Amino acid sequence: GFYGILKAMDGVVPYRLEMQAKLPAAGCKNLYDFWGSRLYFELTQNDKSILNLASKEYSKSIEKYLTLRDKYITIVFCELSGDKLVTKGTYAKMARGEMVRFMAENSIENPEDIKKFDRLGYAFRHDLSSDTEYIFERRIEITSY
């Protein structure tokens, strides 16, 4: 949230600043207020397609500006816990990074090709996904001793 939109070779310094953190500078109450619609317009100036790999906290900075012309696909990484699919934060964060690597290594530009992602035990779930939300389930191997 602090740096805005970054390019592949942009340098950053490690920091921990959440989007909803109070921001007394520039008359803004938080980073959502500071960035306003600028992040959305930067993302959509050349293409109206957005693949959302961000956490819910960061997604909020874009979603409220979406229009009907935008193609917005949210990626969800989850696993079965009891009889429910749940997102486990640490694994989801690892999977988001791994998906970016997968897309870069395979020069992926078509959203359909993202469905081939199969790293870290995740597989695309056709039955749970839609045109706007791609669900990837992590299969956990249960080892008995």
Where are these regions (language model features)?
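Internal, well-folded beta-alpha domain core
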Residues: G1-S130, I135-Y145
